[in-house]
């Protein structure tokens, strides 16, 4: 059950809240089903806090410490999680529509089989994150760190991956139709070959696509 004193303190002052948390590191904050719609919690220490089924529509969580926080079933539509530390967050069944994760730490997070359309992951750290079978249509991954990220069977239609770091990124059976991969770093022919692309997919300039039919292709590195 949510703690009323904790709710009042957090809503009144993030600065005082952070001081209280420093002095009470053993207490796990409980905000189960609390209405935080539109609240400004930027730079708040919310490590391991319980936000199950909480309402955070349009909340500002920029720079917040959200490591191992519990957001199962919460409403995070339109929330700003830019520069937040999100490692170990539990987001099962959370509504993330329109969220902003610019420069967020999402390393190893589980986003598999989720509807993440139109989300902004620009410059985020998604190393080893699991996005298998997720709907990532029109998602922005500009300059994101996608090393060893799992995109197996994901829908990346119209995704913007320009300048992303993709060494070891898993793309098996991912749909990259109309995706933008210009200036992507460390992308190999084998990675492209394992995915589905179309003639509107924009690959890096160091790769070349040879179409053998309407759907079949061969990818190779350009000779220098």
What are the residue ranges of the model-derived segments?
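Tandem repeat scaffolds
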Residues: 5-8, 15-16, 20-224
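Terminal targeting and flexible regions in eukaryotic proteins, enriched
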Residues: 1-2
């Amino acid at each position: 059950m949510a703690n009323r004193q904790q709710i009042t303190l957090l809503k009144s002052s993030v600065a005082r809240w952070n001081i209280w948390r420093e002095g009470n590191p053993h207490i796990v904050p409980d905000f189960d089903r609390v209405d935080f719609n539109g609240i400004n919690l930027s730079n708040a220490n919310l490590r391991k806090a319980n936000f199950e089924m909480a309402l955070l529509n349009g909340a500002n969580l920029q720079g917040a410490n959200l490591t191992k926080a519990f957001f199962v079933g919460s409403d995070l539509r339109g929330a700003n999680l830019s520069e937040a530390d999100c490692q170990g967050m539990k987001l099962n069944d959370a509504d993330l529509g329109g969220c902003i994760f610019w420069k967020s730490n999402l390393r190893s997070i589980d986003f598999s089989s989720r509807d993440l359309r139109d989300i902004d992951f620009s410059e985020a750290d998604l190393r080893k994150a699991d996005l298998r079978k997720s709907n990532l249509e029109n998602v922005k991954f500009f300059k994101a760190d996608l090393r060893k990220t799992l995109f197996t069977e994901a829908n990346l239609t119209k995704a913007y991956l320009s300048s992303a770091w993709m060494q070891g990124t898993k793309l098996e059976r991912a749909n990259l139709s109309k995706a933008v991969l210009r200036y992507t770093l460390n992308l190999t022919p084998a990675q492209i070959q394992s995915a589905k692309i179309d003639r509107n997919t924009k690959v890096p300039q160091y790769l070349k696509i040879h179409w053998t039919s309407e759907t079949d292709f061969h990818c190779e590195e350009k000779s220098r």
